[in-house]
């Protein structure tokens, strides 16, 4: 940001928040509505984005949080396992042109019924990659709590395997 490069931030939920939200849904019902489930488990990203934006504004960097429906980021497929199909760029481009840093929720989008949907676990990384692709970003830098790319979340699945080499196209799958 200080170097005057245009930056887009994509945030996941803070550590443990998504798992806590999933646990809360299970306490309510073992047959939770998939649409409501996605609405609940995607709320951690909203909190993170607002906190990041608040901090950036506090230190003098113009920013605001963007929820997936505000961008919008369109998805297709089942709840809990949707995939990004399109991202409308105009609002974000206009905000960047005004000198702002957009902080966009990862892990989520909106479907054809205008309902929030979530991507699979690790979806914030996938969101960042797709946003980088749509905006033709020079780079996509991912900061994460694990070193490297794994077949699944190594914090949840002990048998997750680290992938030594992966193409940009494979990351988008």
Model-derived features: where do they sit?
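Nucleotide/pyrophosphate-binding catalytic subdomain
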Residues: 1-173
């Amino acid at each position: 940001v200080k170097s005057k490069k245009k930056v887009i931030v994509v945030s996941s939920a803070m550590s443990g928040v998504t798992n806590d939200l999933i646990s809360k849904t299970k306490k309510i019902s073992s047959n939770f509505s998939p649409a409501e489930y996605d609405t609940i488990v995607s709320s951690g990203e909203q909190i993170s984005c607002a906190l990041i934006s608040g901090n950036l504004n506090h230190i003098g960097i113009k920013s605001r949080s963007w929820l997936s429906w505000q961008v919008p980021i369109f998805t297709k497929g089942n709840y809990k396992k949707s995939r990004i199909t399109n991202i409308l760029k105009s609002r974000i481009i206009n905000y960047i042109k005004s000198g702002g840093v957009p902080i966009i929720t990862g892990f989520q989008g909106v479907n054809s019924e205008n309902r929030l949907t979530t991507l699979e676990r690790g979806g914030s990384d996938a969101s960042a990659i797709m946003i980088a692709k749509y905006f033709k970003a020079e780079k996509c830098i991912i900061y994460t709590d694990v070193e490297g790319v794994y077949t699944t979340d190594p914090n949840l699945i002990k048998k997750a395997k680290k992938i030594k080499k992966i193409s940009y196209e494979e990351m988008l799958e």
